[in-house]
């Protein structure tokens, strides 16, 4: 499998913040409590969580966690020009990018400033980089390469009902984007369509042909 799982103990003593780096991980995918050691609660996002390859605990949470992650893999970097004309939002898909590591300005073309997360950034959910507010630049973009990109797959929410489609060949979908929308209802990533593990989902009337990218076992 491209992703690995193991049990790791992380402990917040005296209710203080603590963290632990998963040495062979490039990105943690999920973290769940297997055996709580503390009287204090362990709540995802409040008293434990993760960012990139680092696990953290706080507020007295002490537990053994099941941690699944992408092991360290070779990265690829490329220079890509992305431009916000007339101060409008624009985006560009980075083909083959599974998880972005960083995006830095190499050569700014615009008078407008380019500030990370304000006028440029990236979305791991659909392998996309974006600019806004007049930022135009050549960016150095580094990322983990993806393994498999499929042809289009139709997933439809009929009568505004929630619907799913499993990709048996996938162990972990990392992006999903609309290729051809059939519904009048909007298809918005994270709201009316998305993915979990190897399953694509739609809701609230979104019907479209999607192009998912994924790791395969």
From Swiss-Prot:
It comes from Aplysia dactylomela. Transmembrane segments: none annotated. This is Lectin ADEL. Glycans are attached at residues 30, 102, 126. InterPro entries: DUF3011. Contains disulfide bonds. The keyword Glycoprotein applies. Activity is stable up to 60 degrees Celsius, then decreases and is lost at 80 degrees Celsius. Binds in decreasing order of affinity: galacturonic acid, D-galactosamine, methyl-alpha-D-galactopyranoside and further galactose-containing carbohydrates. Has hemagglutinating activity against human and rabbit erythrocytes.
